[in-house]
Amino acid sequence: MQATIYDLDGNTDGEVDLPDVFETPVRSDLIGKAVRAAQANRKQDYGSDEYAGLRTPAESFGSGRGQAHVPKQDGRARRVPQAVKGRSAHPPKTEKDRSLDLNDKERQLAVRSALAATADADLVADRGHEFDRDEVPVVVSDDFEDLVKTQEVVSLLEALDVHADIDRADETKIKAGQGSARGRKYRRPASILFVTSDEPSTAARNLAGADVATASEVNTEDLAPGGAPGRLTVFTESALAEVAER
């Protein structure tokens, strides 16, 4: 399987054989498992205050009064789980292990599988990306890594007929629910992933929904956000050679 190399003007600059890693069968189950493990393992531990619902002088009157043995204060039940302002019966605990295990071979295969999915135009389209070309992934010359201005990247994406995906991701939506008040107000789709050789692209990192990564560090979550394989991806020629070793 071959891919066309494009220069910074969007013109054809040769062809390159895609590495064998792009022939890996797409394992959506492993990709989802790897993404869930990555998300779970970076979560912060959380739990209730040890004394929540117990800071009260309420006491039970005991037997002989013809009423339930429930601790009361000012005539209202306290402390017990079934009472308003009582403690939680089984609250979340910080000592609980919420991490997920993933075998090294599973992690490696998930990355290779996610890379292969970027070369499947049907999967990329099904994921919701907007582009007007038949060939994916997009491969550009190494001169791309020298770009410093975002507008230069925008011009290249327009020439390659993939800039519509940036416009799609620029349409943010306000989330429903309590998360919108906790620093997670907007929902923004993931757009193009830029994979370079030496350093992550500074010119492309501020585009709406875009992510940047190096070929040696790109992971399953970069290639398949949310566990959905088939992200629209731009590789430099050198980065394409490096991912062959993943």
UniProtKB/Swiss-Prot annotation:
GO terms for cellular component: ribonucleoprotein complex; ribosome. GO terms for biological process: translation. Residues 37-103 are annotated as: Disordered. Keywords: Ribonucleoprotein, Ribosomal protein, RNA-binding, rRNA-binding. Signal peptide: none annotated. Part of the 50S ribosomal subunit. Interacts weakly with proteins L18e, L24 and L37e. Has been cross-linked to L18e. PANTHER family: 60S RIBOSOMAL PROTEIN L4 (PTHR19431). One of the primary rRNA binding proteins, this protein initially binds near the 5'-end of the 23S rRNA. It is important during the early stages of 50S assembly. Makes multiple contacts with different domains of the 23S rRNA in the assembled 50S subunit. Belongs to the universal ribosomal protein uL4 family. This is Large ribosomal subunit protein uL4. It comes from Haloarcula marismortui (strain ATCC 43049 / DSM 3752 / JCM 8966 / VKM B-1809) (Halobacterium marismortui). The gene is rpl4.
